[in-house]
């Protein structure tokens, strides 16, 4: 694109592991996520009690990491390589964001299977935006983003295809 303000960029990449229980299983998942991303992990808590799954409200049941900047781009390149740079159109939302799953943490380079820990999967969410979208989030002089400046599904597919060589089916 000729206009720099119209070129989409990766705002952030969120890597999430839903374990479903607290305890040693969650601690193992946090350690794996810390090793893969090289960044501190944040715990996710249950929003409500689910007796069928023995989950209580505010119990830690998952963990996540938010990557930005160069770390996000490097992780995204690796994660897309694991899924063979192929995504399905249903993995995109109307705002141009994309989410996909990675079934085994052992697919990442340098990660080996440990029988004491087991195998963990993870969800990767990529938020794509255009420069200037801060105007809708800032405190002073908040404005709406014009419709023609919002990232659409087609824009994000074209961006991922051009920047990362992703094929969308």
Curated annotation (Swiss-Prot):
Q: Does the keyword Zinc-finger apply?
A: no
Indicate whether RNA-binding appears among the record's keywords. Answer: yes
Instruction: Please give the InterPro entries that the UniProt record associates with this protein.
Output: Ribosomal_uL5 (IPR002132), Ribosomal_uL5_arc (IPR022804), Ribosomal_uL5_C (IPR031309), Ribosomal_uL5_CS (IPR020929), Ribosomal_uL5_dom_sf (IPR022803), Ribosomal_uL5_N (IPR031310)
Recorded GO CC terms: ribonucleoprotein complex; ribosome
GO process terms (BP): translation
Kindly give the PROSITE patterns that the UniProt entry links to this protein. Answer: RIBOSOMAL_L5
The superkingdom of the source organism is: Archaea
Q: What Gene Ontology molecular-function terms does this entry list?
A: rRNA binding; structural constituent of ribosome; tRNA binding
Q: Which Gene3D superfamilies match?
A: 3.30.1440.10
What Pfam family is a match, any one? Answer: Ribosomal_L5_C
The alphabetized UniProt keywords are:
Ribonucleoprotein, Ribosomal protein, RNA-binding, rRNA-binding, tRNA-binding
Family note = Belongs to the universal ribosomal protein uL5 family.
Q: State what this protein does.
A: This is one of the proteins that bind and probably mediate the attachment of the 5S RNA into the large ribosomal subunit, where it forms part of the central protuberance. In the 70S ribosome it contacts protein S13 of the 30S subunit (bridge B1b), connecting the 2 subunits; this bridge is implicated in subunit movement. May contact the P site tRNA; the 5S rRNA and some of its associated proteins might help stabilize positioning of ribosome-bound tRNAs.
Subunit structure as annotated in this protein's UniProt entry: Part of the 50S ribosomal subunit; contacts the 5S rRNA and probably tRNA. Forms a bridge to the 30S subunit in the 70S ribosome.
- Report what the protein is called: Large ribosomal subunit protein uL5
Q: Which organism is it from?
A: Methanosarcina barkeri (strain Fusaro / DSM 804)
Q: In the record, what lineage is assigned to the organism producing the protein?
A: Archaea, Methanobacteriati, Methanobacteriota, Stenosarchaea group, Methanomicrobia
Question: What gene is this protein translated from?
Answer: rpl5
